Swiss-Prot record:
Residues 728-739 have a biased composition (Basic and acidic residues). GO terms for molecular function: iron ion binding; L-ascorbic acid binding; procollagen-proline 3-dioxygenase activity. It catalyses: L-prolyl-[collagen] + 2-oxoglutarate + O2 = trans-3-hydroxy-L-prolyl-[collagen] + succinate + CO2. This is Prolyl 3-hydroxylase 1. It comes from Mus musculus. InterPro entries: Leprecan_dom, Oxoglu/Fe-dep_dioxygenase_dom, P3H, Pro_4_hyd_alph, Pro_4_hyd_alph_FE2OG_OXY, TPR-like_helical_dom_sf. It comes from the Eukaryota. Residues 404-442 form a coiled coil. Its EC number is 1.14.11.7. Residues 702-739 are annotated as: Disordered. Residues 567-681 form the Fe2OG dioxygenase domain.
Amino acid sequence: MAVSERRLLAAMLAVAAAAALRVAAESEPGWDVAAPDLLYAEGTAAYSRGDWPGVVLNMERALRSRAALRALRLRCRTRCATELPWAPDLDLGPDPSLSQDPGAAALHDLRFFGAVLRRAACLRRCLGPPSAHLLSEELDLEFNKRSPYNYLQVAYFKINKLEKAVAAAHTFFVGNPEHMEMRQNLDYYQTMSGVKEADFRDLEAKPHMHEFRLGVRLYSEEKPQEAVPHLEAALQEYFVADEECRALCEGPYDYDGYNYLDYSADLFQAITDHYVQVLNCKQNCVTELASHPSREKPFEDFLPSHYNYLQFAYYNIGNYTQAIECAKTYLLFFPNDEVMHQNLAYYTAMLGEEEASSISPRENAEEYRRRSLLEKELLFFAYDIFGIPFVDPDSWTPEEVIPKRLQEKQKSERETAVRISQEIGNLMKEIETLVEEKTKESLDVSRLTREGGPLLYEGISLTMNSKVLNGSQRVVMDGVISDDECQELQRLTNAAATSGDGYRGQTSPHTPNEKFYGVTVLKALKLGQEGKVPLQSARMYYNVTEKVRRVMESYFRLDTPLYFSYSHLVCRTAIEESQAERKDSSHPVHVDNCILNAEALMCIKEPPAYTFRDYSAILYLNGDFDGGNFYFTELDAKTVTAEVQPQCGRAVGFSSGTENPHGVKAVTRGQRCAIALWFTLDPRHSERDRVQADDLVKMLFSPEEVDLPQEQPLPDQQGSPEPGEESLSDRGSLHKDEL
């Protein structure tokens, strides 16, 4: 049988299979033969006349019909692409021999367009007449806005289907978070008997986004073991969603309004226009899949961020093989990321060079990147030659993918935009300066007056306030605990570490020049209960954290109680052989409740940052070591505004926001021990371990044993503290595992 005959037979079989696919789809339970636009119109008409069962019937059918049509498009395009791929011998690249033989060139074109026609025939037979599956742009927008659920929640409520009403209302509100009426409806539903928390379901939730957000939440709660399966599931669902999104891009050409009246193009220009539009749509899937209705902007670098979360989560559970695989995969997208290279080097050292070298990046990520870069090359080429705009949704695209002429044009446009922005910015700064000069003095007085509440306990003294520390919402106090208490808590840390503190005595991947031991309040109490550490030391640890919480709450004159967000007693020890020419820090400058971008002078308050943290404190247990000073900076992470030297019984407290970037200098000799505490004003984010610790303390001790010393009616600490013998440069510092 000739090659052409075999191709024709394959095409006929594919078209027949496509027709069978449509018949099979129409016989499925979810298929509704009526068009979604007609069903939606019937539903709105039923709503107008108060026919609530009619609203439910038609709106539910409209949603099912639209979902079935979407599924049919996906199946047809996937099936036809699989059954009728481009012919293996169809070389689409330049062939010098074709220019010498016009007949061969014509045959080449015919083979190409023959493949196109056969694919089109397959799709036509599978999808059916175009009129059967086209929705108007306006109606598609209504479905995307989740409007059917707005009608459904009222109708369900009217016919006493409360569980469905709650789910429909919640689904609509997730897509329309500014809709005040629906917010009021949801508040009302929450007060009704019989309504459960599980009823508030998003019926349109995207599986990949649901798993990602759940995984990130568990990651932020420092539960890496539980976060990993959700982040891995998010990746699997992402690639499925990406293929579906891309398949749906292969629709009719969008003429953009009435442009079709003036559209005039030859064969190849028309093909180019349509294909580039399809490629643009496919690249835009990056943005679509990274978007969530509750966010103003999509997640930045959404796919690579999965591997970033996973590499550190796997490290935290001791799985270096997977940590290396995810780190290498992340580096496919950002090959110059210094921190990731440091992490990879650390993981490699822990696993072994030979075994680590055999681990490759994930294959599906490599394929994704290769395909995406090829598409970008075509899109940038079309932008450069035909002027068809393309906005790259990714920040990881290598510069060499963009044509040089286009690079120069974009550079010129950026420089112009920057110049205009700077001129506007300078003008705004002048105006702001005039306003600030008038308000700054009164604001400073207000802040200082607000701070300076009682220190509650005898022996505690104010060492530095916000004014001395050159900032706001900052304080350093001494005498919080005694020398004996410091030594006992230090012994507790080292004893708990030998009993298993969850870190296995290893160094952090970010600070390979130090090792650390740590123990939480709950862990210490459990070890005390088991007799592995002195129970009274664990009780002291619990009491001291409560003492610091009360003092911070009082000093900053907070109207709302502080709740523990996380508590950690940790010791960091310098590794002697690793200190030569050391330039790193125990922890670089950061902000406790947002992601600091020092270059842009901004801090993004979103996960994985602990956005719910409001105040932070660190209580030092010793000062007999070198380095390890705590320091505050400006948002640029370079300009140091104050520095604090640790010593026994000294506490540093501050608000956790952008006003207080801070870091920790390297510990170059000895061991630095401290209790790190984070607090929240939101009881919903109260530390679960603390609640368990409270219950365990009640079980193990009598009320008299856990009562703190009587709070003293001391005067407010409003004035500037008396300067001590130390200068600002002699005072204290910290790390993510601390502050």
